[in-house]
């Protein structure tokens, strides 16, 4: 009976989430009461269902405007910014899936840095992870979602890394330059990068980090010297030649999930290096918590072994000024812990 109730509970929980989006309060209340009646007598006696009840209550915290309380004068490079690695990759199977929630949900959760991988599909740029098309387009879905969010929450700023995932560079550049040159979007872009950019400079706007050349008059910064599968110093270059430097950690390829401890170590070292920068420093920090060790060390395997230990370490050390941190499965328990810590650490930002 307990097992059957557990299955039924999960079905009702899924229906509740769907109903909250589609129907009115009355239906939601009915479903909620039903779930409560199903779980109340069982949670007290069955530890397995007790865990299920706890998980049902453990919803993702919504932080749609957490930057609002931060001072305008705070340099962007001194903010701990949670990001999602391969932000649009919710399809493609265990080997390619890196997120469990879509980009609008990530925005509401408090994610402020996005890793967008694009490839020409038809006459538009589709979002891909390797060969897996994610059934969304940059022009139709992703960029409009960013703009709409900033219109709703103008206190926020977004950092968007753009990368050509496949196809020809000329196709990528041609299509991307059209959207980035659109007059209707110009006021939502940070047009010129400076290492000393403040939150006031960027509120209500997107700061682009270009990993591939798209256009000469690009908004944001070009990433120069991004070494594959390594930790290095990265140059962030404005179109007029003005430069900044970032501590970059992007070591993603491992033999298997058994090497997750190594990944934790390199991430912590990069974040702590950024955190230890002098108050006057305008050096940026970019850390990718994501990794794979295929075939068995999938992104989810690594996320489960890496996200929480890093969050726990940062909490223990009370680390601040952590820089931009790209995370797999931001809505899962370990990912949520890391996202929440990074956001909350800004209360005492230098």
What are these regions (language model features)?
Residues 21-29:
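Bacterial N-terminal signal peptides that target proteins for export
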Residues 209-350:
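C-terminal active-site rim and adjoining tail of enzyme catalytic domains
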Residues 180-194:
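Acidic, His- and aromatic-enriched active-site or binding-groove loops in soluble protein domains
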Residues 117, 160, 208, 325:
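Conserved, mostly hydrophobic/aromatic
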Residues 156-166:
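Active-site groove signature of glycoside hydrolases
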């Amino acid at each position: 009976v307990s097992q059957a109730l557990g299955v039924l509970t999960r079905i009702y929980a899924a229906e509740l989430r769907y109903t909250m989006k589609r129907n009115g309060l009355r239906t939601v209340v009915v479903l909620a009461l039903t779930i409560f009646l199903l779980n109340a007598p069982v949670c007290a006696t069955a530890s397995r269902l007790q865990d299920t009840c706890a998980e049902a209550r453990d919803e993702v915290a919504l932080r749609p405007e957490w930057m609002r309380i931060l001072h305008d004068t705070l340099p962007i490079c001194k903010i701990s910014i949670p990001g999602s690695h391969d932000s649009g990759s919710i399809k493609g199977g265990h080997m390619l899936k890196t997120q469990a929630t879509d980009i609008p949900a990530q925005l509401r959760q408090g994610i402020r840095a996005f890793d967008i991988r694009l490839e020409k599909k038809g006459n538009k740029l589709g979002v891909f992870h390797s060969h897996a098309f994610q059934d969304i387009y940059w022009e139709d879905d992703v960029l409009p979602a960013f703009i709409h969010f900033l219109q709703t929450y103008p206190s926020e700023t977004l950092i968007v890394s753009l990368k050509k995932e496949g196809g020809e560079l000329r196709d990528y550049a041609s299509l991307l330059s059209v959207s980035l040159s659109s007059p209707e979007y110009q006021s939502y872009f940070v047009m010129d990068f400076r290492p000393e950019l403040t939150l006031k400079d960027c509120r209500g706007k997107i700061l682009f980090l270009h990993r591939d050349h798209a256009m000469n008059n690009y908004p944001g910064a070009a990433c120069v010297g991004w070494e594959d599968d390594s930790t290095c110093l990265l140059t962030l270059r404005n179109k007029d030649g003005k430069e900044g430097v970032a501590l970059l950690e992007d070591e993603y390829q491992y033999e298997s999930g058994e090497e997750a401890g190594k990944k934790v170590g390199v991430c912590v070292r990069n974040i702590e290096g950024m955190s230890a920068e002098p108050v006057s420093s305008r050096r940026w920090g970019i850390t990718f918590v994501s990794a794979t060790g295929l075939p068995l060390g999938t992104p989810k395997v690594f996320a489960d072994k890496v996200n929480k230990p890093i969050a726990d370490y940062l909490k223990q050390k009370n680390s601040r000024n952590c820089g931009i941190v790209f995370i797999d499965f931001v809505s899962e328990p370990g990912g949520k812990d890391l996202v929440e810590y990074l956001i909350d650490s800004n209360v005492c930002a230098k």
